[in-house]
């Protein structure tokens, strides 16, 4: 494949690259990306792009051809645009979310998702679920698209009210005329997912009993719904992973019967029998056909390499040719045409950062479409290298170290940046936050501490009961390792994190003292009992997997366990000896804003240095450009004041 670079003119145009004599402006990293998603239409003739000007979002439809004309656009302004997908050649489905408390519902504000159909021929848009009686106009996840007798249909999971009780329900929506039909009501137990066949029939239900912690799989055969699998899963539903390889089977992740540390992918036939997909214990993500109708491959993280496996040999060879066209870069499939011959890929260059490219397998050509971050140049991208070290108890910890560009990697100031979750993980992909900090002269360590996902179930379980304990010292063990290597100056280290990473930052100031000069928590839990109690209230006192999950990870026997206070930064505020920065969005529905106000009050009462920055109208995920940049600017100012890079 020959690669040619070409600009991509959009309504919100790609900013030309600029060479910065000094560090790039923080806005290069902190504002919303130039492009958040690129989807190619089924016939490959058009592109649907979710673009931004750094704050406002817009859907732009353009012809795929170089210099192709504008086909349509929708301005979403400050609305949080979450996903874009084609439904044939004339319809684009857009998913958005907002933080709200609908009229008539009790409880705290929550994040609600809505889906729209944009007709690129008529230029009209329509809210899915808009006119359905006895149902909310929200969706519980992205729609599935199927064609029935040439007509595009959207299949969405919605909420149908029966006697004032909301019940998850599968709906079928005719995108040609808007007609909506309730396809499956889910039954008595909580049905949390469906698989839909290519011809638009429900194949399977995923069900989860929150009280008992039982997950079950129901498959629809000739005699109706039959429960074919039932598993105890106290920490949450196993769910469905889509349709299987033949388009009629269904997929679910299960613990391997022969090795409890492994999770494998089972493929269930309509008679309830199943096979285990070969090598699926190595899979991190699945690849379905462009229309979602069948499983065609998987993605595995092997070391730091993202490897694609396609079950069809020709498709596998085609992907190998795509990757070969971008030597030295990390290549990810973003979208592809129905015939799988035109692909949009995200190309993550360790030198230039991420960009989108269009690959035409028939023409054996590829061209760049647009950079992901406007104004980001080679001078603004720092080197990321994998590291590996032993924790104090001998457990191997992996992670990533970002080294500031142009600096000798010796005696550097360090920022420890633990990920959220905590059942999540960091990867070597471009990370705007760590790159921004590196651009200011800091080395940045992102460890995959125990409890992180992607390293086997035993590694996750190693984190149970280790909040503020071994999960915390896994971070400081990384500091000691880098200090021993001479890479960083152990007297110039701060810790910064969001969500669980925010908790880890506060625990670094209260529980694992003497390691850090300052700590910044963004939306971090601080009073763990209050945090879990607030989650439990959503279920009105009923047993539930959410409460069980948090108590398991925190190592508490129940909501009244006094050990929660010993690992809660709020209760340990008097031990703080370093400056603390707290940043929190007012619209956070995951870790409530009150968690940071409680911590600020406790620190002030103890006479400790603290600053609280409130992000107006911001959620847990830093979805807005202005407040995302406000967060980043506040963190950098705090670091430069308390841990100067020079």
Positions of PLM-derived features:
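Beta-propeller folds
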Residues: 3-5, 9, 19-343, 350-352, ...
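Short coil/loop residues immediately preceding or within conserved phosphate-binding loops
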Residues: 26, 35, 56, 81, ...
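Conserved hydrophobic/aromatic "anchor" residues
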Residues: 40, 49, 86, 389, ...
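Non-catalytic accessory segments flanking enzyme active sites
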Residues: 192-195, 298, 307-407, 432-435, ...
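Flexible loop/turn segments at secondary-structure boundaries
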Residues: 259-263, 284-286, 303-305, 351-354, ...
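Cap/lid segment of the alpha/beta-hydrolase catalytic domain
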Residues: 375-491, 498-499, 533
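Active-site-proximal cap/loop segments of hydrolase catalytic domains
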Residues: 449-646
């Amino acid at each position: 494949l020959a690669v040619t670079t070409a600009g991509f003119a959009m309504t919100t145009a790609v900013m030309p690259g600029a060479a910065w004599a000094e560090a790039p402006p923080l806005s290069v990293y902190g504002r919303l990306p130039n492009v958040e998603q690129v989807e190619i239409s089924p016939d490959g003739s058009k592109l649907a792009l979710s673009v931004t000007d750094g704050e406002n979002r817009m859907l732009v439809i353009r012809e795929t051809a170089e210099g192709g004309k504008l086909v349509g656009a929708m301005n979403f302004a400050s609305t949080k645009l979450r996903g874009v997908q084609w439904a044939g050649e004339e319809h684009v489905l857009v998913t958005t979310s907002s933080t709200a408390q609908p009229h008539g519902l009790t409880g705290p504000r929550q994040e609600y998702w809505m889906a729209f159909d944009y007709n690129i021929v008529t230029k009209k848009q329509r809210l899915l679920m808009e006119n359905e009686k006895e149902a909310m106009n929200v969706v519980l996840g992205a729609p599935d698209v199927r064609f029935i007798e040439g007509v595009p249909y959207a299949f969405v999971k919605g909420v149908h009210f029966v006697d004032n009780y909301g019940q998850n329900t599968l709906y079928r929506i005719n995108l040609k005329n808007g007609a909506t039909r309730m396809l499956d009501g889910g039954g008595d137990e909580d049905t949390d997912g469906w698989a839909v066949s290519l011809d638009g029939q429900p194949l399977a239900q995923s069900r989860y009993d929150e009280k008992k912690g039982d997950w079950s799989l129901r498959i629809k055969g000739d005699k109706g719904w039959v429960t074919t699998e039932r598993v105890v899963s106290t920490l949450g539903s196993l769910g469905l992973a889509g349709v299987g390889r033949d388009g009629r089977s269904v997929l679910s992740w299960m613990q391997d019967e022969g090795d409890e540390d492994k999770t494998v992918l089972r493929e269930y036939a309509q008679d309830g029998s199943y096979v285990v997909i070969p090598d699926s214990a190595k899979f991190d993500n699945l690849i379905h056909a462009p229309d979602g109708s069948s499983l065609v491959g998987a993605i595995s993280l092997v070391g730091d390499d993202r490897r694609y496996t396609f079950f069809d040999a020709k498709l596998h060879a085609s992907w190998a040719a795509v990757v070969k066209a971008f030597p030295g870069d990390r290549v990810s499939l973003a979208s592809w045409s129905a015939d799988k011959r035109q692909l949009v890929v995200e190309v993550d260059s360790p030198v230039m950062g991420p960009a989108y490219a269009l690959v035409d397998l028939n023409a054996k050509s590829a061209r760049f479409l647009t950079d992901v971050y406007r104004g980001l140049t080679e001078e603004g991208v720092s080197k990321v290298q994998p590291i590996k070290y032993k924790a104090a108890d001998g457990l191997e910890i992996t992670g990533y170290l970002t080294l500031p560009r142009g600096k000798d990697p010796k005696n550097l100031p360090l920022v420890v940046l633990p990920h959220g979750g905590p059942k999540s993980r960091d990867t070597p992909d471009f990370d705007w936050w760590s790159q921004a900090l590196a651009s200011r002269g800091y080395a940045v360590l992102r460890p995959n501490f125990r409890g992180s996902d992607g390293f086997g179930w035993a590694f996750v379980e190693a984190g149970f009961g280790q909040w503020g304990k071994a999960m915390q010292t896994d971070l400081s063990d990384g500091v000691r390792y880098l200090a021993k290597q001479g890479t960083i100056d152990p007297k110039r280290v701060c810790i910064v994190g969001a969500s669980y990473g925010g908790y880890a930052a506060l625990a670094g100031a209260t529980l694992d003292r003497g390691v850090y000069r300052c700590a910044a928590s963004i939306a971090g839990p601080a009073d763990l009992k209050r945090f879990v109690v607030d989650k439990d209230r959503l279920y009105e006192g009923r047993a539930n997997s959410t409460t069980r999950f948090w108590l398991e990870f925190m190592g508490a026997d129940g909501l009244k366990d006094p050990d929660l206070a010993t690992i809660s930064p709020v209760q340990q505020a008097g031990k703080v000896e370093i400056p603390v920065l707290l940043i929190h969005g007012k619209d956070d529905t995951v870790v409530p804003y009150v968690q940071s106000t409680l911590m600020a009050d406790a620190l002030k009462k103890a006479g400790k240095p603290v600053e609280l920055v409130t992000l107006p109208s911001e959620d847990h995920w830093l979805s807005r450009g202005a407040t995302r940049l406000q967060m980043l600017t506040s963190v950098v100012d705090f670091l430069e004041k308390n841990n100067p890079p020079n």
